[in-house]
């Protein structure tokens, strides 16, 4: 299994921007020293939910501040970008880092953020599909090309340079939770990124959709990659880990407020809401605990086919020192036990035989932060 921090720099107070960015760099540097494999950078705009409006610039800063760790986006919200510029900038970043980057993409799910760019959420899926097609063409076409879509038109024949450092392009991840996302990932050889908030039955169902889609397309189902984002805190005792729950609850409630456009002067109205996930289910789907309990939970994820874990540790104003202790303890006591694990061969067999699980979560904020569909 591979592990990396997920960064989106939440800032409930809407203050101290520079120090928040500096703290994030220190967290990433510590994770590299401890043997974490990568870092993922979110994209969010216009609120204290997350200050990551320029993921490729932030990725470049991280690259300058580290030596080895891989750097990925999770995700570039494709409908909010001019896709040729996105492809160009990602290619340049790929060269500057000598191939340390990978590109996570998503269609987005927040009407408030998209509205700020003059985009309706109902347009996000076709804009995403067209944008991804254009990005792929920009990276791979060696001769002049054009494109005619509903939203994106490239009428002047062009060839885009530079081509990426990695061939044919940086590895792609797709942030998403729907069966359609799994089918798209299968068709385009993209690594899916889903959320533990689906519950393990839901995640297993998604992996099944992905494996069956690849099988139906005549593609290999051996050695597949599947990524899982988990809200995580590692502490010496379960009691100490659970003391961080208010920070997670703020993040989830802020996410819900964004979904409902309850934002004033950039501050989300992060309040309790009807239909919040029951505490026992919430604790099952988040990863708060001592090292031993976290090892057990992550082994369960590996057993159903998960190969990559996105550790969402920075949420809701959690103290930097507490977060650094969590990163350190996880790196020293959890990572060494799990890093050599691979999913059992039976995970693919079970995935092929599995059926879709419906209704495993609702769109109430308890979801992946950069949904691809």
What are these model-predicted stretches?
Residues 3-7, 39-41, 71-74, 101-105, ...:
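Hydrophobic faces of well-ordered beta-strands that scaffold small-molecule active sites
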Residues 52-73, 127, 131, 327-343:
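Alpha-helix-loop-beta-strand connector modules within alpha/beta enzyme cores
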Residues 32, 59-67, 90-101, 184-187, ...:
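Acidic (Asp/Glu)-rich catalytic clusters
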Residues 125-161, 201-307, 339-373:
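An alpha-helical appendage that flanks or caps ligand/catalytic pockets
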Residues 38-62, 77, 197-200, 312-324:
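Glycine-rich, proline-tolerant flexible connector loops at the mouths of alpha/beta enzymes
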Residues 1-65, 69-71, 167-170, 348-353, ...:
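N-terminal beta1-alpha1-beta2 module of alpha/beta enzyme domains
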Residues 3, 35, 43, 62, ...:
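Conserved, mostly hydrophobic/aromatic
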Residues 2-17, 79-147, 191-192, 198-202, ...:
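Flexible, glycine-rich active-site loops centered on histidine and acidic residues
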